[in-house]
Amino acid sequence: MKTLLVFFFLFGSGALIGQIHKTENLIIVTLDGMRWQEVFGGVDSTILVDKRFTRDSEDIARRFWSPSMEERRKKLFPFLWSTVLEQGQLYGDRNIGSEVNNANKYKFSYPGYNEIFTGYPDTAVNSNKKILNKNTNVLEFLNKQKGYHGKIAVFSTWDVFPYILNKWRSGIYVNSDQDSLGFNSNNLKLIEQMQSLTTRPLGIRPDIFTYFAGKEYLLAYHPKILYIAFDETDDFAHAGEYDQYLHSAHAEDAMIADLWNTVQAMPEYAKKTTLIVTCDHGRGDKIKEQWKDHGEDIEDAGHIWIAALGPDTRAEGEVKTAMPLYQKQLAPTIAALLGFHFTPDRGVSEPVSTIIY
């Protein structure tokens, strides 16, 4: 691949000049705790046949297995390995020398999401408790920019996101878990009824309702930035249910495809929207039983991945990186795609220049 150098010329408002960009809207999607091993390699054959983790190995093999790694991963993530592969970029396949890492040492959710959105791996962010985040996040920064105020929306399954993004200070609309959908939209009213009446086998709003709430909000209110945060992959992994972990990952890929196709059919979004897909942390693999887990004591749980697709992102497919990339680079990348320069409260973090022309 060719190395792209991006030169930023800044002025006081944080906007960029000297760079032509086409992205006017941004969609961000996270799959909580989704391992890079399945994203780039498909179903793990060792876990597949382990009856402790996979109840119906024959069914999973029929749906997702192939002797070919390329076929396996495409069966599991057809959108990533068709549209994104052909038109965008994927980072994190360590088998080809593409490394993406957590910069934070904790390797679990709140520190990971903090790093994604603030660009700073804060050592004070070291629990998953509902503590208001003191760090300024990139969505909060963009909410203050002309044309973006009140045009940012977040829909999450996990109910800690209002604290991670500090919605009370940032002014960002964040709808999480059991939050009501009090909008004048018949479809959103229906989703409100459905999510209030449905069973909650994982103790959280099912990802499908998080998705449809976000999609219907986009159709009704046309935000400039939409973030959808899925959670089921992490929950099923912790439960040791590999088959359900795979089913959720496959379903979330389909939801991402549906959302991308939806915006490509809308004139205000088509050819003006960039999609970023990533995760908050990885999981264990060197010790196979640790696929369920993550955290500071699991060496390889900080290995993550990024996918990007949009009008300012070259069609490179799998990208080999000369140097490791870090999760903290996503916040300035998000801003740069929209023509702004975001500086973390502390530390220095540069955008992923290859995602941007």
Please annotate each region the language model reported:
Residues 64-161:
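Long, well-ordered early-domain segments
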Residues 118-131, 171-202, 206:
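Acidic, His- and aromatic-enriched active-site or binding-groove loops in soluble protein domains
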Residues 167-169, 215-258:
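Active-site His/acidic residue clusters
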Residues 50, 278-309:
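Histidine-centered active-site microenvironments of extracellular/periplasmic hydrolases
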Residues 145-146, 312, 321-357:
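Non-catalytic, well-ordered alpha-helical segments in soluble enzyme domains
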Residues 27-28, 36, 253-292, 334:
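Metal-dependent active-site segment of extracytoplasmic phospho-/sulfohydrolases and closely related
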Residues 1-22:
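Bacterial Sec-dependent N-terminal signal peptides
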Residues 19-89:
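Active-site-proximal N-terminal segment of extracellular/periplasmic enzymes that hydrolyze or transfer
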